Regions:
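Eukaryotic scaffold repeat domains enriched in small/polar residues
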Residues: 1-301
Length: 301
């Protein structure tokens, strides 16, 4: 019998070999993952060759694109209109069709923006239904940017620190919830902060372990990938638990939480770096650093 993870209505089995086959025996460094409206899966792989890998829901490789554009691919977000936003730590945000046509490049590859301005190693970009684009920026500075649909800067906020509205390193992911709050993963401070879309601090969920990514399903349930304790070039990562996944409601009430370090299916040998929930409630977790893989968690109903 397969091991199960989670609890209550949020119980899952895991397919730890999803996506592997003759064409792709193993994944490289899986930096980002997202699904489109048909539940096709888009895996942004940084190594050995930066590229977007596109899969069927069953895990069959359909297409690759972006090989000549990405340098240090990091995050991907796909909107309901079928447009993908990708971030690259080479200081760019790119906008794509889902078949790999490049629509726009914001920022200049290899050149960080001025201090406080876009971009300095951005980590995640996402678009609201109104067309505004929010960018977690990122590894090179402690900022969140609000851009219009043409990529023009409207507002920025954030400084280094531990107080409300301040950020630790790095500012890693963003998502707008059904209440109109911008959720920002403040990885270095072990929390997800909440803001208005104009940058006013509203509150936070502080009971997290180095949160890397946040994603919401169609019901407004919140899924968070937590890296847990470890170390980086900037020093130790202090976290009370993880690596793992936490599922909560919009009030921060934990619905399910699990995770432990290891190589077995459902465990995390390194850092859960990216997460996305599909229309059926299944979700994908990409890992980076010492152990590169993608696991699919299948919801039991």
């Amino acid at each position: 019998m397969s091991a199960s993870f989670g609890s209550g209505s949020y119980t899952y089995t895991v397919d730890a070999t999803w996506g592997r086959g003759p064409e792709l025996p193993s994944f490289g460094l899986v930096s980002g993952v997202a699904c489109d409206s048909q539940d096709r899966v888009y895996v942004l792989q940084r190594e050995p060759q930066p590229a977007m890998l596109v899969f069927s829901p069953e895990g069959r490789l359909l297409q690759t694109w972006g090989e000549q554009v990405f340098r240090m691919a990091h995050g991907v977000w796909i909107g309901p209109d079928g447009v993908a936003f990708c971030t690259d730590r080479a200081h760019t945000v790119t906008k794509w069709t889902l078949d790999g046509t490049l629509l726009a490049t914001w920022g200049k590859a290899g050149e960080p923006g001025p201090p406080g301005q876009p971009f300095n190693e951005p980590a995640r970009a996402m678009q609201t239904p109104a067309g505004d684009v929010f960018v977690a920026d990122g590894y090179g500075q402690y900022r969140v940017h609000r851009l219009n649909a043409d990529g023009e800067l409207q507002r920025s906020w954030g400084v280094e620190g531990t107080g409300p509205g301040q950020f630790g390193w790095p500012v890693h992911s963003v998502w707008v919830d059904p209440r109109g709050r911008l959720l920002v993963t403040d990885r270095g401070n072990n929390r997800v902060q909440h803001f208005t879309l104009d940058g006013e601090y509203l509150g936070e969920w502080a009971n997290l372990g180095s949160p890397n990514d946040v994603c919401l399903d169609s019901e407004g349930t919140v899924y968070i990938a937590e890296g847990g304790p470890g170390s980086t070039s900037r020093g130790p990562i202090v976290a009370s638990h993880g690596p793992g996944v936490t599922i909560m409601d919009l009030d921060g009430q934990i619905l399910a939480r699990w995770g432990e370090r290891g190589d077995a299916p459902g465990q995390f040998a390194a850092s859960p770096h990216s997460l996305w929930v599909d229309s059926r409630g299944d979700f994908y977790v990409g890992e980076v650093t010492t152990h590169n893989r993608l696991q699919k968690f299948i919801r039991q109903r």
